[in-house]
Amino acid sequence: MKSKVVYIITTVKCSACKCMEYILKEIQKDDPTFTITVIDFYDVPEWIKNNVTLTDFPTVIFTDNNVIKYHFTGTLSGQKVIKIMNDINF
């Protein structure tokens, strides 16, 4: 079974991070094939730190079976996120 996870890397009081979490949860209502995991910057797993340079927040990372398919920093519209998900066959 494949495990699709969208990680949202955040920091304390990051309002853009909350916004991105809301956008992803809205997308998830129509596409329940992935889970969303919110992680504080200080708790990011080593395998993510080794593969993604965290320069700003939110950093959103799309993974499939712990393989990073795509990542971006900042807040995007739901339409743009859906396009990314379609482009990477997520």
Which residues are covered by each model-predicted region?
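Local sequence-structure signature of Cys/Sec-based thiol-disulfide redox active-site neighborhoods
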Residues: 1-29
